[in-house]
């Protein structure tokens, strides 16, 4: 049976690991160290570690794999194949070249578009109507290896980064399992990425999280769904942060300054730069838990006036 080392960290990687383990001999799992999570900073294992332990697979958690003692241990396992999916570290050539069949990665974009750590976010932020998964060879340069297989999936108006993560995770697992038999048999010729079509999906900055109400409504709508459920787009209300977790887009055009609110007893609409409307559905005022807009308008939202503007 083919011996595989799997490397991954977030929930995205779990279905891929589980599918691999159902058919192949996963001899080791490498993931990031446990990290403090939440306000109480509780030390929490990555989702992949939890899944690996349930599957009784040995787990390695080096802080920096390149300089760790675990690197030589992994090379000594003499795996047939290394598979990664959102692991989170650049791997050294000594490891990439050690398995018989090399090292491959499951990446959540249609490469060469969106190399980097936030491909799903950027597909939503840019208003794409489709994205997908690419399986490619691992090289030391970020997401630059030759492509082995690729599969597309639509992005709907109702999708956000969270829903697309779930869909792409399942798609990645399916594509990997469909690809591996021919790949291991040497029947697939990989295709080089077109350097002229390369784009990057760098980690989201704090500046990208803040809503600029002078932007067109469609741009703001894509920002909100592209940053949900993490890190969440925000604006300000009376100079305090106000997160918008979920919203819809209304292309009806109205007169008014960007950021101006239109409201009734149960709903809230905000005028964007082109006069179209953002309709928040799930929000989080400063110091409060997230809530639906109806609950907000039945409480603190009753104090808003039509002269109130977001972002001031």
From Swiss-Prot:
Pfam families: Formyl_trans_C (PF02911), Formyl_trans_N (PF00551). Disulfide bonds: none annotated. Keywords: Protein biosynthesis, Transferase. One of its GO terms (molecular function) is methionyl-tRNA formyltransferase activity. It comes from the Bacteria. The keyword Transferase applies. InterPro entries: Fmt, Formyl_trans_C, Formyl_transf_N, Formyl_transf_N_sf, Formyl_transferase-like_C_sf, GART_AS, Met-tRNA-FMT_C, Met-tRNA-FMT_N. Its EC number is 2.1.2.9. It catalyses: L-methionyl-tRNA(fMet) + (6R)-10-formyltetrahydrofolate = N-formyl-L-methionyl-tRNA(fMet) + (6S)-5,6,7,8-tetrahydrofolate + H(+). (6S)-5,6,7,8-tetrahydrofolate binds at residues 109-112. GO terms for cellular component: cytosol. Belongs to the Fmt family. Attaches a formyl group to the free amino group of methionyl-tRNA(fMet). The formyl group appears to play a dual role in the initiator identity of N-formylmethionyl-tRNA by promoting its recognition by IF2 and preventing the misappropriation of this tRNA by the elongation apparatus. This is Methionyl-tRNA formyltransferase. The gene is fmt.
């Amino acid at each position: 049976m083919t011996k595989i080392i799997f490397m991954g960290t977030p929930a995205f990687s779990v279905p891929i690991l589980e599918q691999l383990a159902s058919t192949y001999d996963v001899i080791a799992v490498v993931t990031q160290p446990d990290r403090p999570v939440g306000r109480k900073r509780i030390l929490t294992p990555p989702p992949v570690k939890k899944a690996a332990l349930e599957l009784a697979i040995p787990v390695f958690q080096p802080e920096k794999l390149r300089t760790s003692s675990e690197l030589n241990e992994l090379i000594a396992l003499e795996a047939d194949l290394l598979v990664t999916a959102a692991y989170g570290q650049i791997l050294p050539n000594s490891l990439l070249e050690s398995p018989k069949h090399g090292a491959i990665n499951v990446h959540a974009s249609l490469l060469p578009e969106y190399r980097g750590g936030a491909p799903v976010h950027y597909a939503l932020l840019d208003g794409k109507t489709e994205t997908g998964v690419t399986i490619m060879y691992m090289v030391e340069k970020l997401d630059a290896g030759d492509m082995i297989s690729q599969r597309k999936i639509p992005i709907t108006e109702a999708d956000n980064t969270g829903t697309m993560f779930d869909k792409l995770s399942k798609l990645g697992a399916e594509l990997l399992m469909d690809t591996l038999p021919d790949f291991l048999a040497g029947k697939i010729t990989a295709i080089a990425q077109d350097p002229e079509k390369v784009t990057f999906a760098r980690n989201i900055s704090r500046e990208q999280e803040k809503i600029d109400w002078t932007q067109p409504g469609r741009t703001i709508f894509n920002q909100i769904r592209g940053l949900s459920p993490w890190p969440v787009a925000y604006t300000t209300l009376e100079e305090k942060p106000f997160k918008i977790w979920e919203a819809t887009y209304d292309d009806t055009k109205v007169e008014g300054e960007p950021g101006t609110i239109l409201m009734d007893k149960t709903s809230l609409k905000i005028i964007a730069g082109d006069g179209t409307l953002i309709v928040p559905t799930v929000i989080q005022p400063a110091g409060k838990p997230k809530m639906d807009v109806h609950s907000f308008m039945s409480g603190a939202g009753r104090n808003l006036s039509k002269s109130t503007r977001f972002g001031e």
